[in-house]
Amino acid sequence: MAKFDLTAKNCQYLDRHLTFPLLEFLLQKDIYDQTSLLKFILQTVSKTNMVDYTMDIRERLNMGDELPEELSKRRANVLVKLKELQTEVAPLMKCMEELKNPDSMKDSKSIVHALQQEFDFKHDIIKSAQKLAKYLYECGNYRDSISYLYICLLVMEPADKNYLTVLWGKLAAEILVLNWPTALEDLTRLRDFIDNHNFSPIEVLQQRTWLIHWSVLVFFNHAKGRDLIIEMFLYKPLYLNAIQTMCPHILRYLATAVIINRGRRNALKDLIKIIQQESYTYRDPITEFLEHLYVNFDFEGARMKLHECQTVIVNDFFIIGCLQEFIENARLMIFETFCRIHQCITIGMLADKLNMEPDEAECWIVNLIRNARLDAKIDSKLGHVVMGTQPLSPYQQLVEKIDSLSVRSEALTVLVERKQKAKTQESGEGNWKYY
């Protein structure tokens, strides 16, 4: 399924360290030639100080398990440089340890003032701390890097030219150690900085595009992420504009979030509108599934796309963890839409629409009824599912009636248009024969 693989597109907007998990994931999928992929990883890792990882890739490429002289010298140089930077930064670490309650101080100026008053603090040492954090990060020592980046953010002013770089570094490191609560805090902090800083239009568009890609990693691993990704990507115009302008492929992840989030079904109409607008620049089985189901009311097309969606998700690093939820919710969406048009359905017909065996479909409906997520009865003798009606207020009845009529009208309109189009094509073919 290389056709729908987004790894190359996504990696353009990720720090090279963030690409390593994606590339290792691809190695397990046999989508691309293993040797070519390993060579690309080796080329990428050679730009870091991760000597051990470099050796691991060399071994997998059968390049020998002995440490080449070049790498041996590089490792020695890395250790020397690391020791130098740690010595330079040691006074700052000691000061921060002895400083009482730095977190409770209002801003960086207060902390720096306290450090200058009590410890004869020199501002240049912050640059050394930033260099050390970056060096540790390049060595793959992300946890220690976070400690220094945290201190840098405590003592640096937002106006500092390196402040934005430190924010990005902190977010990357938190993602790489899988610390999702703090990563979300850093993501919010970085987004606020980008939105309120005086960037040029091109710069701010680039920053938002990078942030969108990094945030996908956070949102699909955080408990609140499924709501937050919808709020940020669909309902923040500046970020929606960035997606439409720079990276419409991100609609895959927005669509996935809406599908697996039952509490956000109200976002479907807005999402589908965007998917239709961008269909000329990007489409995949996930976006097409929604189009088939909610625009064309093509249940057969939706069923076929759902099958393709499973293959896409299995091969996508960002959303593979959502596979079962996606299938369950997509089936439920097909079922709900189908039931709004038909009140009585045969289990066989339903099984066909849901890509299930009849027994499996019946069991699935029984579980829905048992869990109070569906008001329906099963007539096992006739093999029918009869939709129930719950008592509603007059207002709710009116809304439901209008909604149901709207869905049926749209479905009929699409059906009539489809038949008319078929007749026109047949007519055109007939006329052509006379020439």
Swiss-Prot record:
Its main location: cytoplasm. GO terms for biological process: formation of cytoplasmic translation initiation complex. The keyword Protein biosynthesis applies. GO terms for cellular component: eukaryotic 43S preinitiation complex; eukaryotic 48S preinitiation complex; eukaryotic translation initiation factor 3 complex, eIF3e. The keyword Protein biosynthesis applies. GO terms for molecular function: translation initiation factor activity. Signal peptide: none annotated. Pfam families: eIF3_N, PCI. It is found in: Cytoplasm. CDD domains: eIF3E (cd21378). Keywords: Cytoplasm, Initiation factor, Protein biosynthesis. Residues 219-392 form the PCI domain. Component of the eukaryotic translation initiation factor 3 (eIF-3) complex. Belongs to the eIF-3 subunit E family. Component of the eukaryotic translation initiation factor 3 (eIF-3) complex, which is involved in protein synthesis of a specialized repertoire of mRNAs and, together with other initiation factors, stimulates binding of mRNA and methionyl-tRNAi to the 40S ribosome. The eIF-3 complex specifically targets and initiates translation of a subset of mRNAs involved in cell proliferation. This is Eukaryotic translation initiation factor 3 subunit E.
